[in-house]
């Protein structure tokens, strides 16, 4: 019997990520996985349902998770989803266990194994599963763009026939894997 994977549409405000992209879905189906995805899960990142080949679409998240072996989400699932998951299922998600203690207790009580993506160590052996580094890199890039947008002057040095404009001076602070 093939492994049944359910992928849910994100429901939190301003969340524009999807837990599974078409390229990875293709690889998993070639390995024999049976993938079921909530309709519109990729809409926020401009991935239409038709981009997911050999994936069954369903608008109902509860029906999707009811008999799924593995459930994929980006943000922690809603309590109704956890309640509908079968005992012994696996959840792969950012769950923020330190903030979401009720969710963590509910997962434990329902005997659901959870791979908390925010807790995957940033080490060489776990590099293929390191979701935090890529997300931190995107956040840093976004912060630089946001900072440049809010500067009172222009960021790059400009030299024209009329004259030159000195560049703005900036200080970038952060701590991450690359900075250690």
Features from the language model and the residues they span:
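Glycine/serine-rich phosphate-binding loop and adjoining beta1-alpha1 elements at the start
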Residues: 2, 10, 79-169
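An N-terminal-biased, well-structured beta-alpha scaffold segment characteristic
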Residues: 2-106, 110
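Conserved N-terminal Rossmann-fold NAD(P)-binding element of oxidoreductases
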Residues: 8, 171-174
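Hydrophobic/small residue at the entry helix of a nucleotide-binding pocket
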Residues: 178
